């Protein structure tokens, strides 16, 4: 029995009653994606898929870079509890809808959902550009709907790559290329918006991004290979195969919890609806867990999530929540306290793109040489170092002293955690669950950013003395990021201990076998 067959039995045999003939899928051979054979075709394919990560992160950077401009445009000034909603609303829907989008890709083909994601993102980016005269509420709604586009792009794009390459160095380098576009995408989105705000008006940046996303969607039609859909079985209904009950309860729980968390700073925990939303989210989480245990085709195949994967995902969540705090308050710091324009701020943050590129491909080279626990520990240390440099940074200081170093260090946390966690899950999951595998990583990464913004806003508003001491609030948020990243370091230590305990019996068994043969 092959390794994939063993994993397939673990995933589908939750109740011990389903074999390959009664599952959603056919053979693994039928599911393999045939990537372009020519070098130019393969490069074009990789570029189109990597652009999904770039435009997804650009959607975050295009508002964070011009938050003061948006505050003035919508008449809300520097109210951080309201401004934080513009990036948080986007990350919220990216993180919550990814799981369902990955399952749809598993059912109906990853290319179809991937291409649709580009066009959906283009449409709502275009609509958001017309929100200038409609107010912040309409703009925030557009941001929510914008986030659904990357929710379809990211898991299905990663699933396409995972199904196109066998485990090995080539696959790791391709995933590293995909991950390397995250920092550059953020900077690119910020630069586009900053240029538009300086020379025209901020909606021009959204119009440009909408055109780029539409072009990528057209390119995906021609350059992304066909992804065969699994053989349909008629034993179970679409409701069961899609796990609609799990989708509804899981997404509802994630949405309500995050909305409550991000609205709490503005309400200062005094309005009862905050607690109602929190309680409702916990109820939905409980229902989700119960439904998934009973589901024939669970949205999250918990049986396939080993302790190793759990440690990796928990570390990923801590690190990316720390990143959310780092990037949001870092950008606000340089503009509000150092008087830097959005355009110049983009230039100051631009070394992150180069650092991210180097970090990503370095990670691709060392993943086969270092244990995953070591890679994740380095990642967590980078997250912690970057936030610590921000938290202790004075206003009057050279750019090269702490700000530059922090900007160089942070991408190593991002780029080491992203491909490592993706490759671990991709290799551990069978082909038909690559969408779910990719969804878990992308869900945690993006949802953690939104959670980090929510927790950061709670700390910041509690410490800023009713807006009279913004710097104190910013530092409090950064120290929260330090704590989150430090938690990730502790988790990786437990992960390393777990790996060591697993390796000892295997080494003893190998030694005994050698003695016997001798």
Swiss-Prot record:
Ranges that cross the membrane: 43-63, 82-102, 112-132, 135-155, 177-197, 204-224, 244-264, 272-292, 311-331, 339-359, 364-384, 400-420, 439-459, 477-497
Main subcellular location of this protein, as a coarse class: membrane
MF-aspect GO terms: ammonium channel activity
Pfam family, one: MFS_1
Cellular component terms (Gene Ontology): plasma membrane
UniProt key word Membrane: yes
Induction: Expression is under the control of the terrein cluster-specific transcription factor terR.
Family indicated by similarity: Belongs to the major facilitator superfamily.
Name of the protein in question: Efflux pump terJ
Organism, scientific name: Aspergillus terreus (strain NIH 2624 / FGSC A1156)
């Amino acid at each position: 029995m092959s390794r994939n067959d063993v994993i397939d039995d673990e995933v589908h045999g939750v109740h011990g009653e389903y074999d390959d003939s009664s599952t959603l899928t056919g053979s693994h051979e039928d599911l393999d994606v045939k990537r372009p054979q020519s070098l130019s075709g393969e490069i074009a394919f990789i570029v189109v898929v990597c652009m999904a990560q770039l435009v997804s992160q650009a959607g975050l950077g295009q508002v964070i870079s011009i938050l003061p401009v948006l505050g003035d445009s919508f008449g809300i000034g520097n109210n951080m509890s309201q401004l934080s909603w513009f990036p948080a609303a986007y990350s919220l829907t990216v993180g919550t809808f990814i799981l369902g989008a990955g399952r749809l890709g598993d059912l109906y083909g990853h290319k179809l959902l991937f291409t649709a994601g580009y066009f959906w993102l283009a449409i709502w980016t275009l609509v958001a550009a017309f929100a200038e005269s409609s107010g912040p509420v309409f703009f925030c709604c557009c941001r929510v709907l914008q986030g659904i586009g990357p929710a379809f792009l990211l898991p299905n794009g990663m699933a396409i790559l995972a199904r196109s390459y066998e485990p090995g160095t080539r696959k790791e380098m391709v995933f590293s290329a995909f991950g390397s576009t995250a920092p550059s995408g953020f900077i690119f989105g910020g630069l586009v918006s900053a240029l538009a705000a300086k020379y025209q008006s901020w909606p021009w940046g959204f119009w440009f991004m909408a055109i780029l996303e539409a072009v990528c969607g057209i390119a995906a039609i021609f350059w992304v290979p066909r992804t065969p859909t699994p053989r349909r079985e008629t034993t179970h209904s679409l409701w069961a195969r899609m796990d609609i009950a799990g989708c509804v309860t899981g997404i509802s729980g994630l949405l309500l919890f995050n909305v409550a968390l991000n609205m709490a700073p503005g309400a200062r925990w005094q309005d009862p609806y905050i607690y109602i939303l929190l309680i409702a989210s916990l109820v939905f989480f409980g229902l989700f867990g119960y439904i998934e245990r009973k589901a024939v085709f669970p949205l999250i195949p918990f049986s396939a999530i080993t302790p190793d994967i759990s440690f990796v995902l928990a570390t990923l969540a801590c690190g990316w929540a720390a990143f959310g705090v780092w990037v949001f308050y870092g950008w606000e710091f340089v503009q509000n306290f150092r008087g830097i324009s959005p355009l110049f701020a983009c230039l100051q943050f631009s070394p992150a793109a180069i650092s991210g590129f180097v970090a990503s491909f370095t990670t691709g080279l060392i993943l086969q040489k270092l244990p995953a626990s070591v890679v994740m520990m380095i990642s967590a240390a980078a997250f912690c170092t970057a936030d610590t440099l921000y938290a202790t940074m004075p206003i009057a200081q050279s750019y090269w002293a702490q700000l530059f170093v922090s900007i160089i260090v942070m991408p190593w946390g991002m780029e080491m955690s992203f491909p490592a966690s993706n490759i671990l899950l991709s290799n551990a999951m069978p082909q038909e669950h690559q969408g779910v595998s990719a969804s878990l990583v992308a869900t945690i990464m993006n949802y953690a950013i939104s959670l980090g913004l929510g927790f950061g806003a709670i700390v910041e508003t509690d410490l800023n003395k009713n807006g009279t001491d913004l710097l104190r609030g910013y530092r409090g948020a950064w120290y929260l990021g330090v704590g989150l990243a430090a938690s990730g370091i502790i988790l990786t230590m437990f992960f390393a201990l777990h790996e060591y305990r697993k390796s000892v019996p295997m080494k003893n068994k190998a030694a005994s076998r050698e003695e016997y043969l001798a």
